[in-house]
């Protein structure tokens, strides 16, 4: 399986994402600059955290216009797994690939610590290796991670089982404690916590690795078993 880590000016979690795939998952991965127009050779696309374009205007508001995002849109339409973490989640929302918005944290402060998440849906291509309602420890590092959507959108997310993760103790004011959501098709996940920072027991825990293992399992079942 071959992954692409999209690198925008200001990305700073791309190395962590690359390490998670190459060294922990053991799969092929490339850094792909934001001006690329073709992602056809990749089986999964990863949008890392950071401060793309300095977070000017709004987080992710400029990155949505990058050439690579047109290719990401195409990959999403093809059903390829797309994972956006932190700033990557913000970019997915700004691009219209996921509903809602990310606002300033309720306390107006940047937050950097490990939090507990509850797995709300383990039937997605990103969460199949977790148990339903499993509580996992994953780091957060954001100033604008307060997820917001209107009541109609929230109702739709809940009815369609699109809420992948919730905070056990809400750190930022996100509506309904939401930490991560998938699109209706189930192949695009956006989450504020950083699973790529929780892939090595030596560095404090590996409870985020199952996100990437789930992607790999889905790909193998779809393309290797049926080959």
From Swiss-Prot:
The active site is at 86 (nucleophile), 194, 196. InterPro entries: Class_I_gatase-like, PRibForGlyAmidine_synth_PurQ. It catalyses: N(2)-formyl-N(1)-(5-phospho-beta-D-ribosyl)glycinamide + L-glutamine + ATP + H2O = 2-formamido-N(1)-(5-O-phospho-beta-D-ribosyl)acetamidine + L-glutamate + ADP + phosphate + H(+); L-glutamine + H2O = L-glutamate + NH4(+). Pathway: Purine metabolism; IMP biosynthesis via de novo pathway; 5-amino-1-(5-phospho-D-ribosyl)imidazole from N(2)-formyl-N(1)-(5-phospho-D-ribosyl)glycinamide: step 1/2. Keywords: ATP-binding, Cytoplasm, Glutamine amidotransferase, Hydrolase, Ligase, Nucleotide-binding, Purine biosynthesis. SUPFAM superfamilies: Class I glutamine amidotransferase-like (SSF52317). The gene is purQ. GO terms for molecular function: ATP binding; glutaminase activity; phosphoribosylformylglycinamidine synthase activity. Part of the FGAM synthase complex composed of 1 PurL, 1 PurQ and 2 PurS subunits. This is Phosphoribosylformylglycinamidine synthase subunit PurQ. It comes from Bacillus cereus (strain Q1). Coiled coil: none annotated. Pfam families: GATase_5 (PF13507). PROSITE patterns: GATASE_TYPE_1.
């Amino acid at each position: 399986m071959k992954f692409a880590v999209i690198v925008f000016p200001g990305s700073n979690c791309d190395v962590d994402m690359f390490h998670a795939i190459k060294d922990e998952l053991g799969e092929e991965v490339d850094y792909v600059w934001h001006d690329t127009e073709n992602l056809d050779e990749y089986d999964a696309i990863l949008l890392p955290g950071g401060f793309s374009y300095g977070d000017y205007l709004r987080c992710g508001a400029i990155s949505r216009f990058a050439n690579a995002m047109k290719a990401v849109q195409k990959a999403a339409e093809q059903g390829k797994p797309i994972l956006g973490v932190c700033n990557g989640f913000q970019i997915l929302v700004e691009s219209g690939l996921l509903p809602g918005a990310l606002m300033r944290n309720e306390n107006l402060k940047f937050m950097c610590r490990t939090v507990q998440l509850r797995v709300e849906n383990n039937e997605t291509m990103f969460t199949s290796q977790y148990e339903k309602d499993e509580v996992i420890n994953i780091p957060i590092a954001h100033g604008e991670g307060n997820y917001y959507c209107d009541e109609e959108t929230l109702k739709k997310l809940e009815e369609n089982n699109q809420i992948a993760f919730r905070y056990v103790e809400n750190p930022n004011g996100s509506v309904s404690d939401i930490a991560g959501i998938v699109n209706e098709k189930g192949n695009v996940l956006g989450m504020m916590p950083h699973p790529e920072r929780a892939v090595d027991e030596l560095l404090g825990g590996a409870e985020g690795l199952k996100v990437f293992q789930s992607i790999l399992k889905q790909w193998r079942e779809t393309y290797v078993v049926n080959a």
